[in-house]
Design a protein with these regions (language model features):
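Extracytoplasmic
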Residues: 34, 42-44, 51-54, 73, ...
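Solvent-exposed loop/turn segments at secondary-structure junctions
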Residues: 62-65, 84-87, 126-127, 132-136, ...
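Extracytoplasmic substrate-binding proteins
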Residues: 39, 46, 136-220
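Short, low-complexity disordered leader/linker segments with a strong preference
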Residues: 1-52
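A short, structured surface patch at a secondary-structure boundary
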Residues: 58-122, 126
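Structural recognition of the beta-strand scaffold that forms the well-ordered cores
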Residues: 55-59, 79-82, 126-130, 147-151, ...
Length: 221
């Protein structure tokens, strides 16, 4: 009888241990699942990213680092960007208003080529690339990065709609700034409507022709 009671007690302890282990594993799995989320980028890819993104690298979309910085009110989370974006930040207002953006790394890029080893050293939570650069996106994913494609032409180069879609996707990456994203979008629409209202009454001969240089140097523009 003593052996039977001892055996029964041992089995009960084993069941309790297994139950406790199962609960722990379930809690860990639940915790792990809650640490990430799935978003859909502009290339239609479903991308798993951390709920809290603290380090982001932008590869081949030059304006995005400045938009992220203004959206967040800081350039601290932009840890890497294209050298062209850095050049604009250094020579323009962005670097003056948000000097922390100047700490971002650029050594991972050489022209259009990306050094994956140098990119890994930046330890990005998310890497943003042009959604039209399909091969780059595949290479980033193959290297283990959470690669999010942002499009520059999906909305037929409608600047207002494109900007709205950029802000919408960035607010999924940085949900803590969703309210700010909404205000930014509203402001851009207001500016557009104000300008349209001012020029609506102009006759065709009164309208001015404009040449907009998006890139200029002594030899190219």
């Amino acid at each position: 009888q003593g052996r039977s009671e001892s055996s029964g007690a041992g089995q009960e302890q084993a069941r309790e241990a297994d139950s406790g282990k199962g609960q722990d594993e379930g809690q860990e799995a639940s915790k792990g699942a809650s640490d990430t989320k799935i978003i859909t980028d502009h290339a239609g890819n479903q991308v798993e990213i951390p709920n809290q993104v603290n380090r982001v690298v932008v590869t081949d979309i030059f304006p995005i680092p400045s938009i992220i910085t203004v959206l967040l009110g800081s350039g601290e989370k932009v840890v890497g960007m294209n050298p062209a974006s850095m050049s604009a930040a250094r020579t323009g207002l962005l670097g003056e208003l948000f000097p922390d953006i100047l700490n971002a790394g650029t050594d991972f890029m050489n022209g259009s080529d990306i050094n994956m080893e140098e990119l890994m050293k930046l330890e990005p939570d998310v890497v943003i690339y042009s959604a039209g650069s399909k091969e780059l996106g595949e290479a980033l994913r193959a290297a283990g990065f959470a690669a999010v494609g942002i499009s520059v032409n999906k909305w037929d180069y409608d600047s207002i709609e494109t900007y709205d879609q950029w802000i919408a996707l960035l607010s999924e990456i940085f949900p803590e700034k969703e309210d700010t994203a909404e205000r930014v979008s509203q402001y851009s629409h207001k500016v557009y409507e104000d300008i349209q209202g001012r020029v609506a009454g102009l006759r065709e001969e009164e309208r001015k022709s404009i040449l907009f240089l998006f890139n200029y140097s002594d030899t190219t523009w």
